Amino acid sequence: MTRKESELEGVTLLGNQGTNYLFEYAPEVLESFPNKHVNRDYFVKFNCPEFTSLCPKTGQPDFATIYISYIPDEKMVESKSLKLYLFSFRNHGDFHEDCMNIIMNDLIELMDPRYIEVWGKFTPRGGISIDPYTNYGRPGTKYEKMAEHRMMNHDMYPETIDNR
């Protein structure tokens, strides 16, 4: 089932050899395309092992692997635009928790997914790692209940956490 050119009109970055890498937070770079399988639930997961942002107080770099999982509805995020968007955090100064919530909010605004979760596993600084997790399920649907369940059971058993 090949996509029609009209379905890809909003996808401008994929295959573009003149990619402009932005060094400041740029949510406008995010692009979406239509989901051809709206009749079923399925997860899309992105693993982004090279996320970088800056500490808002010291300006020191913070490094993380970011996991973004979502159940799409009508729209899906285009992966190259997501890569460029995440790269735009390179010189953005914010706390880890804020970065994960900003990412989730921007993706909700772009796609209006049924469900989404964003998990950042930051490398230690000062001997402590921070792993913020945030999620969202569309209000009034089974996905809202799913979000509540996943949040209440997230990292419930520390002995089974293997993220380092």
From Swiss-Prot:
Which source organism does the UniProt entry give? Bacillus velezensis (strain DSM 23117 / BGSC 10A6 / LMG 26770 / FZB42)
List, in alphabetical order, the Gene Ontology terms for molecular function in this entry: preQ1 synthase activity
Q: Which GO terms describe its biological process?
A: queuosine biosynthetic process; tRNA modification
What Gene Ontology terms describe where this protein resides (cellular component)? cytoplasm
EC numbers on record: 1.7.1.13
Q: Which SUPFAM superfamilies match?
A: Tetrahydrobiopterin biosynthesis enzymes-like
Q: Where in the cell is it found?
A: Cytoplasm
Q: Does the keyword Cytoplasm apply?
A: yes
Q: In which pathway does it act?
A: tRNA modification; tRNA-queuosine biosynthesis
Could you say which protein family the record assigns here?
Answer: Belongs to the GTP cyclohydrolase I family. QueF type 1 subfamily.
Report the catalytic activity: 7-aminomethyl-7-carbaguanine + 2 NADP(+) = 7-cyano-7-deazaguanine + 2 NADPH + 3 H(+)
| Protein name as catalogued | NADPH-dependent 7-cyano-7-deazaguanine reductase
Please indicate if the UniProt record lists Oxidoreductase as a keyword: yes
- What task does this protein carry out? Catalyzes the NADPH-dependent reduction of 7-cyano-7-deazaguanine (preQ0) to 7-aminomethyl-7-deazaguanine (preQ1).
Residues at the active site: 55, 62
Q: Looking at the record's lineage, which domain of life comes first?
A: Bacteria
Record keywords, A-Z = Cytoplasm, NADP, Oxidoreductase, Queuosine biosynthesis
Q: Which PANTHER family match?
A: NADPH-DEPENDENT 7-CYANO-7-DEAZAGUANINE REDUCTASE
Annotated positions binding substrate: 77-79, 96-97
